[in-house]
Amino acid sequence: MHYPTEADTSTGPNPSATSAPVRPRHVTPSLSPSSSSSPSPDSFYYFLAAAVILTAALAAALLTPNPGCTIVITGHTTIIQGSCPIPPQLVLAAHPRGLSLEQYLKFTNTLPDGSQHRSHR
């Protein structure tokens, strides 16, 4: 007759059966380095929209006239309006008949609205 021994009735863990504990696996989404560096399809459209807006803003800025300096040269007169830091040589070379230094000084006294400074002589 066989009597149960302590090894047969043991409620403790069996060393051969529990050498590697088995844990339940929880599946969590993990980002691999390759998937985190590639943009999603939605981000492509955001980048495209940003590029289009930036290009449109740049084109609008470049096509807007700048009222800083206006020079009109005709056969008889030269009109300089606005704040134009122009050397006398450039004005003399630009006018077909040439200008005297006195006329250039009159141009340099021109206010941004086109009127002349009043000089006391």
Swiss-Prot record:
Chain intervals for the UniProt region annotation (Disordered): 1-40
Ranges of the Lumenal topological domain: 1-43
Location within or outside the cell: Host endoplasmic reticulum membrane
Compositionally biased residues, Polar residues: 7-19
Record topological domains on the Cytoplasmic side: 65-121
Principal subcellular localization: host cell
Transmembrane stretches, start-end: 44-64
Pfam family, any one: TGBp3
Function: Plays a role in viral cell-to-cell propagation, by facilitating genome transport to neighboring plant cells through plasmosdesmata. May induce the formation of granular vesicles derived from the Endoplasmic reticulum, which align on actin filaments.
Family according to the record: Belongs to the Tymovirales TGBp3 protein family.
Extra information: TGBp1, TGBp2 and TGBp3 seem to act together for cell-to-cell propagation. TGBp1 is the main movement protein that physically cross the plasmodesma with the viral genome. TGBp2 and TGBp3 would facilitate TGBp1 function.
Protein name per UniProt: Movement protein TGBp3
Lineage, opening ranks: Viruses, Riboviria, Orthornavirae, Kitrinoviricota, Alsuviricetes
